[in-house]
Amino acid sequence: MESISLKAHAKINLSLDVIGKRQDGYHEVRMIMQSIALHDEVVIEKRAAGIKVECDKPWVPEGSGNIAYKAANLMMERYKIESGVGIKILKRIPVAAGLAGGSADAAAVIKGMNELFNLNADEAELMDIGKQVGADVPFCIKGGTMLSEGIGEKLTKIPSFEGVNIVLVKPKVGVSTAWVYSNLKLNEISSRPDTELLIKAIYEKNIGCLAQNMTNVLETVTIKKYGVINDIKNELLRLGALGSMMSGSGPSVFGIFENEKQACLAYEGLKNSEWECFVTQTI
């Protein structure tokens, strides 16, 4: 096998709580993460030497500035791969959007290289490498519905929440995760998610309960600077969403809809706006 193609799925947060800040500067989180159907296409191929990263979108860094390059480099060092690797990314997930697009690409590179070079590494090994690349990469390797704790590396599987209809909206701003966390004041968080209630709703497939109780503590920081996030949340609710929330550090916002028809109607109502819009599903 000389090449392999993988789907790199985006993620949303169904909740996001920040518990505290560690001495090393990292924040302790407790959040529910969910894969969605929206994805990049990542093609990995063997080449004579070196690592080459290419992307069909000019604003996505190529070469060593791309997280996928870092993932490939770590794989080559860990498993002493002597030949080279070429990585082509067909970008569909918006960048700097709180959707783990870069992490998803890196996870695809780790999984793809394991298969392409017949490394036979188990998932735990791959996740260990992923952890060195970025906090969201281990989740992107596993995918599905997960409770994420620690700095994002402790993952506990939750029953699948697949097939839920989502409308995803990305305004024309990019948000730095580092900036959001550095401006988060833990003593000013007034509303935290009831994570146990949300997990119970997932177990019971109670979409309404989950949608109405989703909470992301980072919204307080990001919305203060980008009021458009609140506008999108309100617009999704006006168009029939059962609930809406910012994903990750933003600025993407999603709404949960009762059925595909309602999601498509909301998408039609939004798609001619100045925002990027997607109709998708949890997987």
Swiss-Prot record:
Pfam family, one: GHMP_kinases_C
MF GO annotations: 4-(cytidine 5'-diphospho)-2-C-methyl-D-erythritol kinase activity; ATP binding
Assigned keywords, A-Z: ATP-binding, Isoprene biosynthesis, Kinase, Nucleotide-binding, Transferase
Protein name: 4-diphosphocytidyl-2-C-methyl-D-erythritol kinase
Family annotation (Gene3D superfamilies): 3.30.230.10, GHMP kinase, C-terminal domain (3.30.70.890)
Pathway field: Isoprenoid biosynthesis; isopentenyl diphosphate biosynthesis via DXP pathway; isopentenyl diphosphate from 1-deoxy-D-xylulose 5-phosphate: step 3/6
Active site: 11, 136
Name of the top EC class for this enzyme: transferase
Role according to the record: Catalyzes the phosphorylation of the position 2 hydroxy group of 4-diphosphocytidyl-2C-methyl-D-erythritol.
Swiss-Prot/TrEMBL GO biological process terms: isopentenyl diphosphate biosynthetic process, methylerythritol 4-phosphate pathway; terpenoid biosynthetic process
Binding-site positions, ATP: 94-104
Family indicated by similarity: Belongs to the GHMP kinase family. IspE subfamily.
Domain of life: Bacteria
Keyword 4Fe-4S assigned: no
Catalytic reaction(s) noted: 4-CDP-2-C-methyl-D-erythritol + ATP = 4-CDP-2-C-methyl-D-erythritol 2-phosphate + ADP + H(+)
Keyword Transferase: yes
EC number: 2.7.1.148
